[in-house]
Amino acid sequence: MGIAVIAGSLILAFAWTAGLFGHQTTSKTFLGDTLKNFDPGYRRAHGKGICFDGTYHSNGAAAALSKATVFAKSDIPAIGRFSIGSGNPHAADNSTATVSMALLLSPADHSQWRMKLNNFPYFPTRNAEGFLAQQKAFKPVPSTGKPDPALVEAFLKEYPEARKSIEQKAKMPLTGSFSGAEFYVVNAFILRAANGQQQPVRWSMRPHSKFISLTKEQRDQADHDFLFKDIKKCLAEGPLYWDLVLQLAELGDPVNDPSQPWPKDRKEVIAGILEVKNVTDQVNGACRDINFDPTLVPPGIELSDDPVLAARAAIYSQSYNARLREIGFGKATDAVGK
């Protein structure tokens, strides 16, 4: 299956999981249906979000691993976005357990490092085709409102790694605040040092704030926009901080399989601290017009041969271009609180 086909199908899958498509959608019309069904001006996934700005304080600890200037000791402007996992920009914050961070770092040499992180440390399947198969297998049957058990079992037989993901997500604590969430990059990247040496890495944003866990009952009763109201309240009291933690792969660790976490005892390097200072509504915030395509990396950081990573560039491009057209016609609106 070609990357372009996978990319288009993934956009469709994101939309389907958000409940935005009817049963008449076909492979020929999915892009047109996408543009019609998504609220104009919103991102095609993680439609509900809020912009933030701050500073990334690089401590120089990773400079020996990569020639990228983002790892030299310096203070770098940061623009980012917090969001929830639903594709619906008007969704309640308790409608999904997924919370996310997107980030753009812009060092003085005019290079850029863009990244997208979620609060789950690995991808459900080993490739993009598996993700599509998962969406099909778990699509509710009209007569029961539940997935067909036979299709689910067939999917899990072909993609057994997904069972681990499903079980872990069922046990994952429900976060009550962006401020204490740890965010992970599930794909591997390659750091290239000035001498040419290469080091595969994944990374996370590890919070300084305490993780706030909610019971299911607390989350079910929470305010429609509780996460976004909370982040505003937290920042009114002062900046929030996350460590950028690089996890270094060793020989034999799966670099091209985002469904397989690396052993927890792998060496870690704290490359710097992200300081988040302010948030602004996404309708007019600095993050609105940014494409947080994680394949846009500076010299010194390279893409691995992870097939999911390869598919993501086209996904982000299609979503971004459609969104900019809509914004250009004045159709962008603010989701939070509406």
Description of each model-found segment:
Residues M1-K338:
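Active-site-adjacent core segments of small-molecule enzymes
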